[in-house]
């Protein structure tokens, strides 16, 4: 039976070449560990960045949907705003009896005892309505619902109508710093009796349709 030694642990001498090899192995192990650690951190950061991007995209999609809903809701609510043209029965189209000679105008046939016409103010209000509808359709992205040729006609027609009536009411400029112009609100104008015109148009209506479009 082999005898047991009572000697304690002793440091085993290592040759320089072996010490160098061990040091290199330890160094490589540490570098590899650091490399894995950096990769893990990069992966974690990358996942966090992608998560934030996805969260922002979802938030923006939700915001966009909310804005579209708001604009559409606002559009429908604003259909009853006070400036919306009144819906007169007959839409401003009237029958005219040629009892007396009328000035020659485009579309007028003097040989007929009855003539059809549209009262200009209703044409103007119709154009305002079309401009408004085109604006909301474009804002909601429904460009196929915008009749560009009709709008161009309406803008030119309204321009000439405004210049024809040429309202010369004075709109006073406020004191500084609000002296850039005038809102025109509250200023008195000399106006025609639109209610009386609308009643006459309904009494002599050509059509029984209701609306302004």
From Swiss-Prot:
User: Any domain commentary?
Assistant: The 2 HXXHC motifs are conserved in ustYa family proteins and might form active sites.
Q: What is its EC number?
A: 1.-.-.-
Q: Which residues are glycosylated?
A: 98
Q: Does the keyword Glycoprotein apply?
A: yes
Is Electron transport there in the keyword field? no
**Which pathway does it take part in?**
Mycotoxin biosynthesis
InterPro entries (alphabetical): UstYa-like
Q: Where along the sequence does the record place the motif called HXXHC 2?
A: 150-154
**A GO CC term assigned to this protein in UniProt:** membrane
**The organism's taxonomic lineage, starting at the top:** Eukaryota, Fungi, Dikarya, Ascomycota, Pezizomycotina
Q: Which protein is depicted?
A: Oxidase ustYa
State any single GO MF term. Answer: oxidoreductase activity
- Per the annotation, the residue ranges of the short sequence motif HXXHC 1 are 123-127
The segments labelled Disordered in the record are 1-26
Write out the entry's keywords from A to Z.
Glycoprotein, Membrane, Oxidoreductase, Transmembrane, Transmembrane helix
Question: What is the originating organism of this protein?
Answer: Aspergillus flavus (strain ATCC 200026 / FGSC A1120 / IAM 13836 / NRRL 3357 / JCM 12722 / SRRC 167)
Q: What happens when the gene is disrupted?
A: Decreases the production of ustiloxin B.
Q: Where in the cell is it found?
A: Membrane
Q: Where are the transmembrane segments?
A: 48-68
What is the topology of this protein in the membrane according to its UniProt annotation? Single-pass membrane protein
Entry's family note: Belongs to the ustYa family.
